[in-house]
């Protein structure tokens, strides 16, 4: 059990005070810590249509051993902007202690879009990891579960069953 996430604000030399809380949850019960765009002197960065850019957050984190940090776009990113995290989910292993950076893509095919300093665009969720090894077998043991090989919405959609062409 981990008591708190250790982080360092690395925004020295900018107009943002070093004491600004750059990693926080909006509510104590939230799963993720909000991450803000850090741009020196409150500048903006233009991202053209279909373009992607890496932006810093001004934060370094110390992910505890046995855990991983997962970076997700905030839900408002998808509902209010054409931005998305280019890799969909970022992974921060416990050994990485550099600045947390985000690769942001403008999904608009027409408009330039701007990110501003302190825009909250991502969240960091820290979860335990499975630390076991991997064992190769020639066949999986039979499962007591009904699902079997069903996937991709195979439950609850009997009308559409067998109407999807799969490319394998």
Language model segments and positions:
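DUTPase catalytic domain/fold
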Residues: 1-168
């Amino acid at each position: 059990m981990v008591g708190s996430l250790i982080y360092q604000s690395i925004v020295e030399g900018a107009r943002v005070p070093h004491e600004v809380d750059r990693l926080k949850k909006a509510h104590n019960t939230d799963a993720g810590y909000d991450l803000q765009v850090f741009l020196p002197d409150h500048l903006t960065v233009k991202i053209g249509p279909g373009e992607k850019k890496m932006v810093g957050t001004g934060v370094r984190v110390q992910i505890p051993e046995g855990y991983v940090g997962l970076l997700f776009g905030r839900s408002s990113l998808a509902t209010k902007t054409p931005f998305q995290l280019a890799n969909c989910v970022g992974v921060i292993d416990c050994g990485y202690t550099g600045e947390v950076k985000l690769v942001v893509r403008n999904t608009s095919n027409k408009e330039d879009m701007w990110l501003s300093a302190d825009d909250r665009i991502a969240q960091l969720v820290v979860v335990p990891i499975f630390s076991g090894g991997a064992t190769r077998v020639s066949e999986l043991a039979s499962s007591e579960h009904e699902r079997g090989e069903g996937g991709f919405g195979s439950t609850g959609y009997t009308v559409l069953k067998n109407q999807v062409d799969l490319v394998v």
